Amino acid sequence: MGRPGRKPRGRARPGLFPFPKEELRQGGSSPANLNAMSKGPVSFKDVTVDFTQEEWQRLDPAQKALYRDVMLENYCHFISVGFHITKPDMIRKLEQGEELWTERIFPSQSYLEEEEVLVKFSDYQDKPPKSIVIIKHKKLIKERSSVYGEALGKNRVVSKTLFEYKSDGKVLKNISEFISRDINPAMGKLGGSKEWEGSILTSKQEKTHPASILHKQIGRALSSEWDLAQHQKTQIPEQRFEYNKCDSSFLMTGVEFPHGRAHRGGGNFNYSKDDITLFEKSDLGIHPHDLMEKKCSSYNKYGELLCRKSVFVMHPSSQMDERPFQCPYCGNSFRRKSYLIEHERIHTGEKPYICCQCGRAFRQKTALTLHEKTHTEGKPYLCVDCGKSFRQKATLTRHHKAHTGEKAYECTQCGSAFGKKSYLIDHQRTHTGEKPYQCTECGKAFIQKTTLTVHQRTHTGEKPYICSECGKSFCQKTTLTLHQRIHTGEKPYICSDCGKSFRQKAILTVHYRIHTGEKSNGCPQCGKAFSRKSNLIRHQKIHTGEKPYECQECGKFFSCKSNLITHQKTHKTETMRFQ
């Protein structure tokens, strides 16, 4: 009936009628008053007096009858002046003479649409009595459920499925997805275990009194869920519960966190003082390391996580910012050990997952799974711009950015933008100096793994990319692509100043410096500047005296390869002269 947090407009001393009768009769909702109020926005709750659970229980039958008459009269007046509303659930119950029930929240907590409460549902007409303990609920806003064919109002609540147990292990109550008809269907949802079968009591064997919540351990019945909450507050102080099988601890007010269910195979919440246990159907067997609750928000003075009486508590080591597993090679940290193991394979080169059809190896099982699809499915994702096909839709999406020119990933240090996140990560290593990929042969380190792969071919002599025109082989595919332009004559890079074209973009960049006069490569010893880095390297050999190029005919050394080639031509000329 209305929101429990709203206070009546009048008060009286405990034991007296808690609102003035004159206020209801004279100032409540007569047609004249409603017509005057209709100049502004008016709702039915504006003419409704709400009671808390304690206030309602203090009313005697005559006072409850007076309240029923006044509220029904208010509703009739409200409709008579032209207000069109759905009949409130409270009015329906008053018309049928049913006993009202109210929600009750814990002290010092404001009413929230999604709040942890302890709720007691009493009998529903002639159906078997039911008592439901709800730890977390949400109000029904758009959807409506039904209980035994009767629609639930918007102020009703729905609950996760819980089972309440006594200290001797027997079932007291069973609650299905909203409100169950009987206890027996729970057997199928609990797996039909014989261990549970003997302990379950049907509603015929043990019925719960409509206005009480049984508390077997202390030997008395508590009159309301409010008394139960107060009793638990005094009997069960905030304490820390530890589970010694994995040395993990959890903190919750008077409730043992269902950590043990990961080890025992059952999901329970144990009130340690009174031995009442709530069992939850869902998520059985899930370790709480993987569970998180949105409402866990505060910490106590010891740095331990506190939670607001909810179904799940976040395990201390599953916090999003905690990364306890550190890579010994590069220092990167991870939340899970499995992530660290996969990451370490980058450094070790281990590839344990091997394709049984082609023998190709992978670091991750997911990569192997995607690869195996190439043998069965091919490349189903086709680019409409260039006709290239891909195995994965995500790869096609990234490829589209090459046509659109989109560069969504920007470096925060220098502002450079990239079309792929992996390119940005590689680029950022130029700022940090990190070189995680190391050659096992010579110890040289590289920023990119592809650069390491190409470098390793200098040790093995492997040149897998072969030109179909002349048969020349190359260790990089990009080098082969540049070489093939010699045969095709393609020069796609054109200078906007003079119109000259080039096969490589790098050569065009160097050519631009002729027009701009830029000489960015300066010698640190003499200050002479050059437009090309290769010219600077050649110049620096003058200072060092280095002459690495030797003539095989006469043994003379040169600092530049071009000078050696020019020199070798003199030997060929002399040979032709003597012939």
Curated annotation (Swiss-Prot):
Protein name in the entry: Zinc finger protein 382
Pfam families noted in UniProt: KRAB, zf-C2H2
Residue segments, region Mediates interaction with TRIM28: 12-135
Keyword Zinc-finger: yes
Composition bias type Polar residues, residue spans: 27-36
Keyword Repressor (UniProt): yes
Subcellular location: Nucleus
Gene: Znf382
Chain positions covered by the region annotation Required for transcriptional repression activity: 325-579
The protein's role, per its UniProt record: Functions as a sequence-specific transcriptional repressor.
Organism lineage string: Eukaryota, Metazoa, Chordata, Craniata, Vertebrata
Organism: Mus musculus
InterPro entries in UniProt: Ikaros_C2H2-ZF (IPR050589), KRAB (IPR001909), KRAB_dom_sf (IPR036051), Znf_C2H2_sf (IPR036236), Znf_C2H2_type (IPR013087)
Region named Represses transcription: 40-81, 105-240
Assigned protein family: Belongs to the krueppel C2H2-type zinc-finger protein family.
Compositional bias per record (Basic residues), positions renumbered to this chain: 1-12
